Amino acid sequence: MFPLNGPGWSLFFEYIGNICYALFMRRMSTKVLAFFTLLLGIAHAWFFVGDISQYDMIGVGWTIDTVNLWGGFIRLLFPFSMGMLLARTFKPRKVKGAFWICTTALIVLFAVPYIPSDNGISLNSLYEFVCIACIFPALVWVGACGSASGITSKANTFLGELSYPLYIVHYPIMYIFYSWLIKNDIYTLSGCWPTALLVVASSILLAFLCLKLYDEPVRRWLSKRSK
């Protein structure tokens, strides 16, 4: 969908989600939103667990063919509405060690290997669906019930602010890096680690500059215009 910057496809759907929120989703009552989320959850389970895309995973949306386009909308709208519902119904409680609970859980979840399909059922997609529908919302709740202060709070804030621009600017740099690797027949980390470190550092620096020189000023301007 976006050949010069691959991650742009997911932001494309996020923009659509934000438009839907501004036009009608924010006006939904909590009961209507809950019913809407339930329907989207059923569609999500049918599409991915039934392996409609034949990808055996939820990784769809990155092209504009029929399966990816509709799959991308389903992939967007279910977690999006789930997040809205969680925000509306959230009741904070104090959870000790929330950071370590969430960190440990994510390490375990991400360490689970690919699960082969069985009798036409995508078990890998089923696992991913359970994570999206149940486990990730629970982890968001636990994380929101935690607290941080001092350096930890500042570090978390900085990393959170940097994550969005880093996601969208790092891939063009990676393309250049890939081209350099292929041109020089380098296929191991031992042969390119200094350049790899430079790629990481330059990606972070570019993301930081985009955040401070573009993202934050534009958001401040838009906030003033909306008042």
Give the ranges of each region predicted by the language model.
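Aromatic-anchored segments of alpha-helical transmembrane domains
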Residues: 38-52, 104-117
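Alpha-helical transmembrane segments of multi-pass membrane transporters/translocases
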Residues: 17, 199-211
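Alpha-helical transmembrane segments in multi-pass integral membrane proteins
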Residues: 24-28, 61-204, 220-226
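Membrane-interface helix-loop-helix regions
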Residues: 1-15, 31-32, 42-67, 73, ...
